Each structure stands twice: as structure tokens, then as C-alpha cells.
A protein has these predicted regions:
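Short intrinsically disordered terminal tails
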Residues: 1-3, 80-84
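An N-terminal amphipathic alpha-helical segment
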Residues: 1-29
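Acidic, low-complexity, intrinsically disordered interaction modules
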Residues: 20-73
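Residue-level signature for short turns and capping positions that connect secondary-structure elements
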Residues: 14, 31-33, 81
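Short amphipathic beta-strand/extended segments with alternating polar/hydrophobic composition
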Residues: 15-18, 45, 77-79
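C-terminal edge-of-domain segments
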Residues: 72-82
Length: 84
């Protein structure tokens, strides 16, 4: 299966990043937000879009998971070792 270079979900543009054969993910950056314990968290609407992207990619037969890192980044990581 060939992956789309960019995917827009709920108005958020996720960019495909292919660093290595085992390091492939979609990423999108929102505002830096903080929870009640002052830990960084993704924007709620961006996180919902990431979860929807997970659902889309799973329906396409991929094994994926969503995560977030610092500075507002959200990633949807693709497990490329699943028969592709």
C-alpha cells in the first residue's frame, strides 16, 4: 500500500515523515497546551483528528497508534512490519 504524502483530517494537515524503513509516521503541530498538572498536552481538536486518522488507517489495513510529544506535536506512527 502506498501512503499519501499529506492527509487532512478535521481541518488538520498531517504530513508523512519517512526517516527510515522502521520510522514512518504522520505528524501535525498545534498549539502548546497544558493539563491541570502543567504537563504538555495536544490541542483537543488535534488529538481527535489524530484518533480519526488512526481509524482511517486501521480500516486501510495498517497497524498504527497515536502519540504526542513536546511543543504541540502529534504523531500517528505506522508499524511498517505488518506485511506491507
Amino acid at each position: 500500500m502506498e501512503l499519501c504524502e499529506n492527509i487532512t483530517v478535521n481541518g488538520w494537515d498531517f504530513e508523512l515523515v519517512e526517516n527510515d524503513v522502521d520510522d514512518v509516521f504522520y505528524q501535525c503541530r498545534g498549539e502548546v497546551m497544558y493539563d491541570d498538572e502543567h504537563d504538555e498536552m495536544p490541542e483537543p481538536s488535534l488529538w481527535r483528528a489524530a484518533q480519526k486518522l488512526v481509524d482511517i488507517l486501521v480500516k486501510d489495513g495498517l497497524r498504527v497508534y497515536a502519540g504526542h510529544s513536546e511543543k504541540g506535536w502529534v504523531e500517528v506512527t505506522i508499524n511498517m512490519n505488518n506485511g506491507l
